[in-house]
């Protein structure tokens, strides 16, 4: 396992962090410099991946990519990899609980080296726990087929995954008025006068000062290494009080077993506990959270509510069904992300959900924000009041046509590709399963750089993530 990125990569990453902070504080940055740094990082990562990751080395060999200094355009043309790589293992390995085999697969797709001890796990949940103790963090997701994706992160990449977004999301949230103007000014001064790593350390130590006025209500699980669950768990650390809809970890064994069927009594017991929490006790969990939310409201405390669209929809419907007069304190906010499918599998109209949140909770429109991300990347794209997802400057985004050829232009639609300079332990040159429209123009909100206007799953790609899974469970 590579302990540290090489010097060229580290220099590029440090430069991109500074640009992220500048973009957060001023809404603009030197886009040409950012692209130069992204190219430097991509070239350095290309060499590391080719030397350390067998799967990527094979891709390079098949593409005839044998040089040591490819440009960004060459990498885009020859080295982009579908995100299906993270579920490319034989499904029989999990069916047979062959975790030695799963470890061998991980070592082919990532720059990691799981121990023999981790391969002796009894089940999938224990396997993830044992790997975590070795400094290997598997973040999982699942489509509606039940085929699990596992993204392997070493300690460096894990730190980037958890912390990089903190370089710009607090400031972008402040721009929408979520925190008081004096805190926004203080945050802006810190962004302009501190090195990024020092700013992250300060956020770790004193982040609760920003959100200490808020009680947090999280419409997800209190544990588990699934993408949106981790976002909620991290945000909860900064709130004065945190309440989770499901006070239990999200078990990958349960998620897979519900869709594909249990293979052992132990697995069935985990599935039964999961269904009890999410289906049988669903109303009780909603009532418990709403009762706590009502108390916060009566005490005059602001609230942050976080979750996926379908769960927020049901929370709002419960408020109306119980005829609660919830008018949360001014400054309360709702953040959401994840799949836009409801429990019956239909798409939830975004405008309808935003209006319902305002009606049932009294949240002002500019305090309702959405984020777009995915399990495989180190970063988050926040949607602005103009309904655009702004792409932070460390990401190189590529729009691909049906033949996976890059499309040029300032307003293009196609399959989204992302080159992530902070993916150190696995290939970060990824073709996603999302079909998007990307524009490059000054946004009316004042923020510069490229932005995504619309998002859908690419043709033939299954619904992915917690939203799609829960929709299937509850259908």
Task: List each model region and its residues.
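Conserved ATP-binding/catalytic segment of the ANL
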Residues: 418-475
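Conserved AMP-binding/adenylate-forming
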Residues: 317, 340-442
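Nucleotide 5′-phosphate-binding alpha/beta core
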Residues: 1-140, 147-233, 241-278, 283-306, ...
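Short, structured coil segments at secondary-structure junctions
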Residues: 238-239, 330, 364, 393
């Amino acid at each position: 396992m590579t302990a540290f990125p090489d010097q060229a990569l580290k220099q590029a990453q440090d430069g991109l962090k500074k640009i992220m902070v500048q973009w957060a504080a001023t809404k603009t940055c030197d886009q040409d410099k950012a692209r130069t740094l992204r190219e430097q990082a991509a070239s350095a990562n290309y060499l590391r991946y080719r030397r350390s990751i067998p799967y990527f080395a094979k891709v390079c060999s098949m593409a005839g990519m044998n040089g040591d200094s490819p440009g960004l355009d060459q990498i885009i043309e020859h080295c982009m990899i579908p995100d299906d790589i993270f579920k490319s293992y034989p499904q029989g390995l999990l069916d047979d609980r062959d975790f030695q085999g799963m470890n061998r697969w991980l070592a082919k797709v990532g720059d990691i080296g799981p121990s023999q001890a981790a391969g002796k796990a009894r089940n999938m949940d224990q396997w993830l726990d044992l790997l975590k103790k070795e400094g290997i963090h598997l973040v999982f997701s699942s489509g509606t087929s039940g085929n699990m994706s596992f993204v392997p992160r070493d300690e460096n990449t894990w730190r980037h995954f958890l912390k990089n977004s903190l370089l710009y999301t607090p400031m972008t949230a402040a721009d929408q008025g979520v925190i008081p103007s004096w805190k926004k000014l203080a945050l802006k001064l810190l962004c302009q006068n501190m090195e990024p790593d020092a700013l992250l350390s300060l956020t770790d130590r004193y982040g609760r000062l920003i959100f200490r006025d808020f009680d947090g209500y999280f419409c997800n699980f209190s544990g588990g290494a699934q993408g949106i669950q981790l976002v909620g768990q991290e945000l909860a650390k900064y709130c004065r009080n945190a309440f989770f809809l499901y006070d239990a970890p999200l078990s990958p064994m349960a998620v897979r077993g519900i869709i594909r069927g249990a293979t052992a009594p132990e697995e069935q017991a985990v599935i039964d506990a999961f269904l009890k929490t999410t289906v049988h006790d669903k109303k009780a969990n909603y009532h418990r959270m709403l009762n706590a939310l009502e108390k916060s409201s009566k005490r005059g405390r602001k609230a942050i509510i976080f979750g996926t669209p379908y769960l927020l929809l049901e929370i709002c419907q419960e408020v109306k069904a119980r005829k609660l007069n919830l008018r949360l304190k001014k400054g309360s906010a709702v953040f959401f992300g994840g799949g836009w499918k409801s429990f019956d599998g239909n798409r939830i109209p975004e405008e309808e959900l935003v209006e319902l949140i305002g009606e049932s909770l009294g949240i002002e429109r500019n305090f309702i924000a959405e984020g777009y991300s995915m399990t495989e990347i180190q970063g988050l794209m926040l949607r602005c009041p103009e309904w655009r997802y702004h792409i932070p400057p460390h990401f190189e985004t590529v729009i691909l046509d049906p033949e996976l050829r890059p499309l040029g232009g300032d307003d293009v639609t196609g399959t989204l590709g992302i080159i992530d300079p902070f993916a150190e332990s696995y290939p970060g040159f990824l073709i996603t399963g999302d079909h998007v429209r990307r524009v490059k123009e000054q946004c009316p909100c004042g923020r510069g750089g490229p932005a995504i206007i619309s998002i859908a799953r690419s043709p033939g790609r299954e619904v992915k993530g917690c939203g799609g899974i829960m929709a299937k469970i509850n259908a």
